[in-house]
């Protein structure tokens, strides 16, 4: 997905709002512009209100971030973003997608499990104040 300067500004605003500045503008720009990256965005009235960003390396996808502005949550946007991200990853040859989430992020965990992700691992003490849970969704079985 190629972004205009205004679209990138909106994307960065969503990232900052949802993740409290976990990525710098430069980091987000680098990831968005990487040939390995997959970006999907949701818009309302021409404004980006949510996005999902990941990448595909060989046959594995990884979800880096998914965020929806608070006033647009609980409307199915995150599910739609994940579905589109998975479709694009599959087009690029991915057979599965991995993600990592804070163990106390109940809302995100509920979304991922609803969308078919399975918990495969726990990284104790990964964050200063929390563990990380690793999830995987298989798009198709490998031989």
What name fits each language-model region?
Residues 66-74, 101-104:
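A short, internal acetyl-CoA/4′-phosphopantetheine-binding micro-motif in the GNAT/acyltransferase core
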Residues 82, 105-108, 125-130:
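Short glycine/proline-centered loop/turn elements that form peptide/ligand docking sites
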Residues 2-71, 82-84, 88-92, 138-142:
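Acetyl-CoA-dependent GNAT
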Residues 100, 113, 118-134:
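Conserved catalytic-core motifs of GNAT/GCN5-like acyltransferases
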């Amino acid at each position: 997905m190629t972004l205009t300067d205004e679209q990138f500004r909106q994307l960065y605003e969503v990232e900052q709002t949802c993740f409290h500045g976990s990525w710098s503008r430069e980091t987000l720009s680098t990831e968005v512009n990487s040939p390995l990256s997959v970006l999907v965005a949701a818009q309302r009235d021409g404004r980006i209100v949510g996005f999902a960003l990941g990448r595909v390396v060989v046959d594995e996808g990884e979800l880096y971030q998914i965020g929806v502005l608070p006033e647009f949550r609980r409307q199915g946007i995150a599910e739609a973003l994940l579905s589109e991200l998975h479709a694009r990853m599959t087009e690029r040859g991915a057979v599965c997608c991995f993600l990592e989430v804070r163990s106390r992020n109940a809302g995100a965990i509920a979304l991922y499990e609803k969308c078919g992700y399975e918990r495969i691992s726990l990284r104790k003490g990964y964050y200063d104040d929390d563990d990380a849970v690793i999830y995987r969704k298989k798009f198709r079985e490998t031989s």
